[in-house]
């Protein structure tokens, strides 16, 4: 019995050692398996980090490239702006030169216009100088008409009142002659002024003649008082000559 027990103990011991070896082997395999996933995870992490780093580097490179491209674009844009500004500055002097040329041309046209106006002005005074010449005969005719109107007054022996009335009428006619002689040079129609003047004088003579015939009843009219009516006629001739 005792031997059996010892054998059993020995057997147990042997079995225990084998079991222990098996356990150790199993544990080793388990540890190896555990280590291999850890190593794999570490490798994956390292690869991921390297990939991330590479990606970051690529991103940085891309960013740098973009930044450099943006900088170059900005520089090109600035250059284009400077070029456009220079072109605009060049275009402005050209515009100013064109404006100056346009201003010079109207000035030339304006200078030519006064030159054209000068001959016209010269011809106008010539016409005006001819107009007074034509007005002179009319003024002489006007001066002769009052003298003719005074002739019947001498023959009829007018009264003193008639002489005074003629004195007042005679100065009025020289004034009318002066105004008409002044109007005649300004007007371009030469015959119309000369024709209108005699007609107006004829009306004045006609109005003076009835008054003289009506007042001819007084025979005591000295001839000396009728003579002052002739003096204004001569004065009118002098004034017309001065105006000419």
From Swiss-Prot:
Which protein is depicted?
Brain acid soluble protein 1 homolog
- What gene codes for this chain? BASP1
Give the organism the record lists.
Gallus gallus
What ranges does the record list as Low complexity composition bias? 119-138, 170-219
Q: Where is the composition biased (Polar residues)?
A: 141-150, 234-244
Described by its record, this protein's role is as follows: May play a specific role in the development of tissues.
Q: In which tissues is it expressed?
A: Developing tissues.
Family to which the UniProt record says this protein belongs: Belongs to the BASP1 family.
Major localisation: cytoplasm
**What are this entry's molecular-function GO terms?**
calmodulin binding; protein domain specific binding; transcription cis-regulatory region binding; transcription corepressor activity
According to its UniProt record, where is this protein located? Cytoplasm, Cytoskeleton
Q: Which UniProt keywords apply?
A: Cytoplasm, Cytoskeleton, Developmental protein, Lipoprotein, Myristate, Phosphoprotein
GO BP field: negative regulation of DNA-templated transcription; podocyte differentiation; protein homooligomerization; supramolecular fiber organization
Give residues where Phosphoserine occurs.
6
Question: Which residues are covalently lipidated (N-myristoyl glycine)?
Answer: 2
Q: Where is this region: Disordered?
A: 1-244
Q: Which InterPro entries match?
A: BASP1 (IPR008408)
Q: Compositional bias (Basic and acidic residues) at which positions?
A: 15-27, 50-118, 154-169
